[in-house]
Amino acid sequence: ERGEENNGDVADDKEVKAEENISDAVQYPVEQKWWTEALDTVKSLGCKSVTMAKVPAFAPHDTEQMATTYAAYFERVAALAAERGMKFCYHPSSAELKATDGVSFFDLIAQKCDKEKVWFQIDTFEALQAGVDVISLLEQYKGRVLSLHLHDRSVVCDSGEIDFDKVIKRGYECGVKLIIVEQRHFTLPPMNCVERSLQNVLTLASVRL
């Protein structure tokens, strides 16, 4: 009886693996076609990098598996980007930066991805929401953070919760190449917020033009 049960289990396992292989065989060409078209478009615009922001929500117990899955996915996209002379960046959300038992989804991605292939874009407000110190993050992943999103609760520099001057200075020291002012939340008319954010950033001593 045990032998029959085991044979059944083995057969089931083979069926599952076969289904997974079929799924992968279907998925990757579709994925590659989409990214090929997207990257060709981005390349035609003169961009030197392309960024993917956050991943679909997942349960805490799936963190390790999701990190393994997305690390492999990011490396495939990074390879396609590299063929076009571009770099691929991953922009983690606050949920992906927040640590559980001392490690975050972002930490796992960083561990699993080749540091020569996958780069990072760090958002100051997402880090704030996650309770993560941006300076420490830049230092921990020195040389791997390609760009920064200067992002505040509303107008950049107005909340006083983030030392943007210090973040920019340390970012440059840690290899950041691109700095972007992000305006997502508005306490004034949108264009007023954008103008004020830009003006605030341009007054910082650390900014290089």
Q: Which residues does each PLM region occupy?
A:
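Active-site acidic/histidine proton-transfer and metal-coordination neighborhood
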Residues: R2-F120, M191
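Histidine-acidic metal/acid-base catalytic patches
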Residues: E5-N7, D13, K17, G46, ...
